[in-house]
Structures are given as C-alpha cells and as structure tokens.
UniProtKB/Swiss-Prot annotation:
Main location: cytoplasm
InterPro entries documented for this protein: Bcl2-/adenovirus-E1B, CRAL-TRIO_dom, CRAL-TRIO_dom_sf
GO BP of this protein: apoptotic process
Top-level taxonomic group: Eukaryota
Cellular compartments annotated: Cytoplasm
Keyword set, alphabetical order: Apoptosis, Cytoplasm
Listed GO CC annotations: cytoplasm
Protein name: Protein prune homolog 2
Domain CRAL-TRIO span(s) in chain numbering: 128-285
KW Cytoplasm (keyword) present: yes
Pfam families in UniProt: BNIP2 (PF12496), CRAL_TRIO_2 (PF13716)
Gene3D superfamilies for this protein: CRAL-TRIO lipid binding domain
Amino acid sequence: MDIPLDAAEIRPEPPNSLDLNGSSTRKIKLTAPNINLSLDHSEGSILSDDNLDTPDELDINVDDLDTPDEADSFDYTGQDDQPALGEAVQEDFESIQEYTAEEERADNRLWRTVVIGEQEQRIDMKVIEPYKKVISHGGYYGEGVNAIIVFAACFLPDSSRPDYNYVMENLFLYVISTLELMVAEDYMVVYLNGATPRRKMPGLGWMKKCYQMIDRRLRKNLKSFIIVHPSWFIRTILALTRPFISSKFSSKIKYVSTLAELSELIPMEYVHIPETIVKLDEELRESESPKAGCLPNEPEMNTLEEEFENKMGDND
C-alpha cells in the first residue's frame, strides 16, 4: 500500500537567486602561477634567460612584411591642397623683407616728439614732408637776434585731399614747434599771401587754433605781422578773428601790397620768396593795381575793399 506524501514535502525549495539565463553558472577557480619579482637572474625571475627569446624565435622574414605599396592607404582629402598651401606660406615668408638698422633709424625719423603747451605731441613728418617749405627763417632785423619768420601760404596743402584735416593737424604742430625753435628774442612774421588759391587758404578754425596754441612768450615777443599781397579773403578772415584776438595783436598787423614795399621794412637778403609770388608781384605792378592785391583767379574788388576799410575805420 502506497503511502501518500504531502504536497508540501515534494515541493522544491524556492531559489535564493533568479536565474535569468535559464542555466546555472559554474564558478571556475584559477590559480595564478608563481612569479619571482626579484631583479636577479635566478630561475623564475623576470630577468631570467629562460624568458628571453632565442635568436631563432627573433628571426623575422622581411619578405612577409607589407611594404607601403602593398599596404592599404587612406585617401586624405587635403592631400592635393598641401603643395599649394606650402607654396602660399613660402610666398608669405618671401614677401617679408629684412628690416635693416638704417631703415629702422629712418622710420624713427618719420615721427617727431614735441612739447607744446606742456603736452607731448607726435608729428607725422612723412605726411607733411611736401609742405615743410611753408615756414622758413628769413634772417634777422635790427640789433641782436630778432628773427624774421616767413610763412608762405602757397605751400599749404590742397583742401581737396582726403586726409586734409590730418595733414593740417600735423602741419600745425610742425609750424608751432618750429617757431619756438627759431625764435630766441623778438621776432616778426612775414605772411606771403599771394599766389595762393582759395582751396589752399587755411580756414578760420585753423588760424584761431594756431593763435591760441602759441606760447605767451611768443605772443609777447611778436613785434610785427606783415601780410604781403593781401586779398579780400584774408582781410575778411582777419576781421572775423578780431573777437578772439587781443587788440595788441591787431595793432601789429600790417598790409604790404608789393615786394618793394616789403623791402623798405625789412632786409630781404635771406628772405626766400617763391617764384610764383615774384611773378605775381610783377603782374600786379604792370597792371598798376598794387592796392587790390587780388589773386589772378580772383575778380577785382577795389570797391568792396574800400567799403571794408571805411567800416573798419568807423569801428576804430
């Protein structure tokens, strides 16, 4: 007679872990070989001769190696551009010229540092090189070292230049700094206004700036400001500048219509007169109109000048 077993007794025990693979994993225990880490050449050491390859094992068959022709190559997209890039870089290096010591000294001479009004200024000497004749030393007058400073307006730059303001700014610094170097004691300025077209005439702002930047010593030592061949335009400019200039300076202004009249006031031995002004003076004397003093390209304005002089006389 069979004895029935309880269902709970024949039921398998629940697993302690989940078998996700459906099969049990068998652990294998590996045993590490004994390695001698000593630095001697004893048996089992990593420096032992037993671990070194024999010459036969080190024999390499060169024929079995892949040569560059047989090996697989990778196409480089920029490979074709590499020579052109190298040539461009080479051209850039070739375009850079060596900067000699003489060129370096010449470059330093292109800039001049001056002190005007207790402020340090730099003058671009290269840009004003064509206009340096605008101011020159005309020798001395009287006793001592009373200098004659000649200012030729015909050498001023044309206002149509794109960099006109930049040129005039540097030229202004050059004129003021040169004036300070030329003047030791009393001096006079001879302003050659003839043969100067309107487009070369300095503006009112530039003349005002010159006057304001002149050192007090230079203003005081200025004894006379002679304007040769005055035109209606320059007379008008000076009339407009009266509000910001002193009455003492206005009294120093003199108008001279010819070079002959100028020679009666100052010694002309060292005064350089440009050829264009000499020619203009001859034309004015031949036309017997020295009083007008107008430029060849300007209309006669005797009537307007007379009215202007009458008004100025009434104001005085």
